Amino acid sequence: MSAAILLAPGDVIKRSSEELKQRQIQINLVDWMESEGGKEDKTEPKEESKAEGSKDGEGTQSESGQKEEGGKETKDADVDRRIHTAVGSGSGTKGSGERANENANRGDGKVGGGGGDADAGVGATGTNGGRWVVLTEEIARAIESKYGTKIDVYRDDVPAQIIEVERSLQKELGISREGVAEQTERLRDLRRKEKNGTHAKAVERGGRKQRKKAHGDAQREGVEEEKTSEEPARIGITIEGVMSQKKLLSMIGGVERKMAPIGARESAVMLVSNSIKDVVRATAYFTAPTGDPHWKEVAREASKKKNILAYTSTGGDVKTEFLHLIDHL
């Protein structure tokens, strides 16, 4: 069996580094993050200089201390904004706890916490007997592939219990940048619809009360109708931010699939690389949506070779496809 050298995008290699080490495959990774980090460091002093200009008359030492504290508060606020549970009822964790206490015996009112031991749900069942859903097909495929649990994608149903996969869990599941952007767009649409729909629900309930007064004979039926129709409006759409694998599994059920690693002797791949220097000796390359800015040039040079195998991601879980290719080359 001849040894193969496989070219792939840097972020794909980085996400798969642990599995590659298990297979005793060498890694040649050209890291592009350092250069980007240098650019970010250069832009930060500009923001500080603007802050200094707006605080004339104050001491230099007190200004620097306040700026450091302000920077921490801003970061904390950004994190808090990302963590939310219920659309249309406030983005803080308190709203989630109130909703949970009113509607069901749940113990995971705190967002992002380790709610694995709470009565958050059995299998993929959420509050009020509903089922947890996700916002994109890619996330649903990744969860099914990793944990063996089939989960539905949200289809504009109300009420609904939606899982928002947050950054740390996105990396764990191998969600692509496009998949992350799609989830963000759907969240924005949901917030917009929920905000516009609140007034419409209030008007609808007011009109129903007027009709109930006009039809005195049907008063009892009107009361029953009002109760049943107001319940889903009160429940609405719940969004649960999930950062940990433990919490996700407590919500949807299932266990992580442990695949036996394939050793170097069983795999034909000797080296994986994103370096343009390895194009000359590469025997195959794998392309996928990537944040590696240098990959486009590497792939272009690789495609010019006559005797090289080209593989492309089908749009599923990129990490899973990459490792599957390595195991079957």
From Swiss-Prot:
InterPro entries: Orbi_VP6 (IPR001399). One of its GO terms (molecular function) is structural molecule activity. Its EC number is 3.6.4.13. The keyword Membrane does not apply. It catalyses: ATP + H2O = ADP + phosphate + H(+). Its main location: virion. Signal peptide: none annotated. Residues 110-129 have a biased composition (Gly residues). The keyword Oxidoreductase does not apply. ATP binds at residue 110. It is found in: Virion. Keywords: ATP-binding, Capsid protein, Hydrolase, Inner capsid protein, Nucleotide-binding, Virion. Residues 27-130, 189-232 are annotated as: Disordered. Residues 36-58, 65-83, 96-109, 189-207, 215-232 have a biased composition (Basic and acidic residues). One of its GO terms (cellular component) is viral inner capsid. ATP dependent RNA helicase essential for RNA packaging and viral transcription. Possesses ss- and dsRNA-binding capacity. Homohexamer. Belongs to the reoviruses VP6 family. This is Helicase VP6-A. The lineage of its organism: Viruses, Riboviria, Orthornavirae, Duplornaviricota, Resentoviricetes. The gene is Segment-9.
